[in-house]
Amino acid sequence: MSLNAYLVLAAMLFTIGVFGIFLNRKNVISIMMSIELMLLAVNINFVAFSHYLHDLTGQIFTFFVVTVAAAEAAIGLAILVTFFRNRTTINVEEIDTLKG
């Protein structure tokens, strides 16, 4: 496949992720999945440019992005589980009512 095909695929995935955030603002899990989809699109760009430029920097950077994304997802889900235990909902509109 050519570089353009990878860039079009990444652009489509990123656009789907952005639309997922804007169209579904009430569910935290859907928002987190959309963010992960956007990170996947960025990683595809890194790997595609790294392959076509014959430089391993993009592929190595992708490993760091995947690691940070996994940590972000784990922390986000842990916060979400704690929030669900306290409020019995995962509605985004309820999150701003936290005491602090």
UniProtKB/Swiss-Prot annotation:
Signal peptide as annotated in the record: none
Regions crossing the membrane: 3-23, 29-49, 60-80
Role played: NDH-1 shuttles electrons from NADH, via FMN and iron-sulfur (Fe-S) centers, to quinones in the respiratory chain. The immediate electron acceptor for the enzyme in this species is believed to be ubiquinone. Couples the redox reaction to proton translocation (for every two electrons transferred, four hydrogen ions are translocated across the cytoplasmic membrane), and thus conserves the redox energy in a proton gradient.
Keywords of this entry: Cell inner membrane, Cell membrane, Membrane, NAD, Quinone, Translocase, Transmembrane, Transmembrane helix, Transport, Ubiquinone
Organism: Magnetococcus marinus (strain ATCC BAA-1437 / JCM 17883 / MC-1)
BP GO terms, sorted: ATP synthesis coupled electron transport
Organism taxonomic ancestry: Bacteria, Pseudomonadati, Pseudomonadota, Alphaproteobacteria, Magnetococcales
Protein name, per record: NADH-quinone oxidoreductase subunit K
Gene3D superfamilies with a match to the protein in the record: 1.10.287.3510
InterPro entries: NADH_UbQ_OxRdtase_chain4L/K (IPR001133), NUOK/Mnh_C1-like (IPR039428)
